[in-house]
Design a protein with these regions (language model features):
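A well-structured
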Residues: 1-228
């Protein structure tokens, strides 16, 4: 992205992505099955550029969050970027669905033939057509991916990464975080591994009410979306 990005830097990156997305959406009313290969390739290149920039900033926010899941600043940034990327994805969704469901087979084959490095990607997209919903429905799912299951996973991370484990090593009780306990799980001494696992599982057992509720709601979310 850039070295030590500030909020101002991130705002500029987001503004650039939003500007390019808005520009791309202007082609919606002019999409036709008989579009020339040259114009089609230009559209693919444009949307690839937007996706690349969105992925970079999304990756940065995820890494910041992974570095310290207890950081309110990192959590806020991740949620902000996730919401922004979801909104941009929804604005570009029309092109994805147009390619999957609205263009006839003859023109699709014609465009795939001249698509070069995008050919296999385009073929794969066509295979997904029968599993795609309407644009309003797909937009709802994209939004729920940020505010629904994804938000629950972040909550789970915050809870479990804050766990403090008490384990007895060589007759001495020690307090450890998850990363420190993991080193004992891989110990070459069976008794130490056993003590580490017991400490790990006991902590999850103590919190089974809240973590179990999170699991159930995530699975229910998948079921509601027709995944499970």
């Amino acid at each position: 992205l850039v070295k030590n990005p500030t909020r101002s830097t991130i705002d500029k990156k987001l503004a650039e992505i939003e500007k390019n997305t808005k520009k791309f959406t202007s082609i919606k009313k002019n999409l036709r099955p008989n579009i020339t290969s040259t114009k089609f390739l230009k559209l693919l290149s444009d949307i690839e550029h937007i996706a690349e920039k969105s992925s970079m900033i999304g990756g940065y926010s995820s890494l910041r969050y992974s570095e310290n899941t207890q950081s309110d600043e990192a959590t806020s940034l991740l949620m902000r970027i996730s919401k922004f990327n979801s909104e941009m994805e929804n604005k570009l969704l029309f092109f994805d669905l147009w390619w999957k469901k609205q263009i006839d087979e003859r023109n699709a084959k014609r465009l795939i033939k001249s698509a070069g490095q995008f050919s296999e990607y385009l073929k794969f997209k066509r295979l997904l057509a029968k599993y795609s919903l309407s644009e309003p429905e797909e937009k709802i799912i994209n939004t729920l991916d940020v505010t629904g299951a994804s938000a629950l996973v972040k909550l789970y991370d915050k809870i479990t990464n804050a766990f403090v484990y008490v384990v007895t090593v060589n007759g001495k009780k020690k307090k450890m975080n998850r990363e420190q306990l993991t080193t004992l799980v891989r110990s070459n001494k069976a008794k130490i591994r056993e003590a580490a696992y017991k400490s790990l599982f006991s902590k999850y057992n103590e919190n089974k009410g809240v973590t179990g509720e999170i699991y159930q709601n995530i699975v229910q979310n998948w079921s509601d979306e027709g995944i499970g």
